[in-house]
Amino acid sequence: MFKIIDDVKNEPTLEEAQKFVGGYVEGITFPNGDYLIVNEEGKLQNLPLNVEATNLWRSTFTKDKYMIGYDDFVVGPAILIKKAALKEWAA
């Protein structure tokens, strides 16, 4: 599952995000300001590959720009909050 939030009125609470990803949340800020929320322990729990979120990750963190992380992958449900929709999750 991959959910994209592009309106601040749809921004999830912490509890809603935890329920969606199935556990503790980990947030990653993308260079463009978008914010990805994943299950912090997803890889330890052997959650299935999230192809959509992984494709987004790899198209953003490319080898020519980043020394580490470009070949990483996302597992389990994920939420992408677009920069314009960030309020409570804004860093």
Predicted features and spans:
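Detector for the mature cores of small, proteolytically processed
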Residues: 1-91
